[in-house]
Amino acid sequence: MDATVKPLYGHQQEAVLGYNPGKPGRPSHVYHCYFVAAIRLVIEVEVQAGNRTASQYAQPGLWSWLEGRPREQWLHLLRGDISWGTERMMQEAEKRGLPYLFKLKKTANVNRQIEKLWGRQDWVSAGAGWHGLNSKLQLTGWSRARRVVILRRRIREPLAVSDQDTNTGQQVFSGMAELKHGRDFYEYSVLVTSLG
């Protein structure tokens, strides 16, 4: 599941100002897409007003689409980025017995969980240079603790450093950070899942 913002020119229906990273200040539509990733098959696209980019606006359409089909035609797993890992989304999936996997935003509480587990020695290989740990986490706004998978990958290359332009607010390149030999630097990704 994903959302794409489409800037608009002219006077199309539902063309409103909203989150529009490519053309700030332009009216837009948002395309909420549901697709089968493994075979790149789009199963549904909902076109909504440009100020309806959040996943909460797409959820009624998703549930309606699923419930309009026999259970054997349902997807086997819901997967989405950080905007989809909300309490409402997870509760609705759990209510229907539909497994999910969502990436979490690295909020202060998610970062605290990473800090707690950082020094453990039982990280297991997850492929492509990533290592992972299972944990339980209950974030503010969640009704209960849920399983999270914390993934980390060692950074070996120099990193680009960015700043924010004070005039435009845009991200600007400000140089490269060289990594010291003998020190480990990691990037992290945290997933919430109902899978066992």
Where do the PLM segments sit?
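Active-site-proximal, Lys/Arg-enriched surface segment
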Residues: 1-33
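Short, conserved catalytic/metal-binding motifs centered on acidic residues
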Residues: 1-6, 40, 75-85, 100, ...
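Flexible loop/turn segments at secondary-structure boundaries
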Residues: 6-8, 41, 51-52, 83-88, ...
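Gly-rich Lys/Arg/Thr-decorated short loops/hinges at beta-loop-alpha junctions or inter-strand turns
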Residues: 37-49
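Active-site beta-loop-alpha junctions of metal-dependent nucleic acid enzymes
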Residues: 46-69
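Short helix-terminating capping/connector loops at secondary-structure junctions
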Residues: 70-74
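Short, surface-exposed basic-aromatic patches at helix termini and helix-loop junctions that form
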Residues: 90-99
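An anionic, glycine-rich sequence signature occurring as long contiguous blocks
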Residues: 99-196
